[in-house]
């Protein structure tokens, strides 16, 4: 696992993919410290990818991890656009179908874990299939 460099050094020392993987690993550890259980990472289905799938009790949690160096232009959370939400919903729908489930049969939610500079914001149930 790549180490997350000190603030501001990320883009110079790691490729975009390596930096993303490092932030996702940090997100996983942070969420596990909050009691969530890891299910899968970087789940790819036709048309999209889910960064993390976790379990919070009986709830399946689809997590989008975002990092921005600063809060300028809205910060990390603001980068999860309506279009991105639709892609995540579609990807989750396909993943659930592979698990013999659906939004109707599985208790699930969509969280965003946003790293902006040195701050972490956890947006539980940030959006849903009724948004």
Curated annotation (Swiss-Prot):
InterPro entries, sorted: Restrct_endonuc-II-like, tRNA_endonuc-like_dom_sf, UPF0102_YraN-like
PANTHER family: UPF0102 PROTEIN YRAN (PTHR34039:SF1)
Sequence similarity: Belongs to the UPF0102 family.
Organism (species): Salmonella typhi
Domain of life: Bacteria
Name assigned to this protein: UPF0102 protein YraN
GO molecular function, one term: nucleic acid binding
């Amino acid at each position: 696992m790549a180490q997350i460099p000190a603030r501001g050094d990320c883009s110079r020392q790691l490729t975009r993919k390596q930096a993303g993987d490092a932030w996702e690993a940090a997100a996983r550890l942070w969420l596990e410290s909050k009691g969530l259980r890891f299910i899968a990472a970087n789940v790819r289905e036709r048309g999209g990818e889910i960064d993390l799938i976790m379990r919070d009790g009986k709830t399946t949690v689809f997590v989008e991890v975002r990092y921005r160096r600063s809060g300028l232009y809205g910060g990390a959370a603001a980068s999860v656009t309506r279009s991105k939400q639709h892609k995540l919903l579609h990807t989750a729908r396909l993943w659930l179908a592979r698990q013999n489930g659906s939004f109707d049969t599985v208790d699930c939610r969509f969280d965003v874990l946003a790293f902006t500079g040195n701050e972490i914001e956890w947006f539980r149930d940030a959006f849903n299939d009724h948004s």
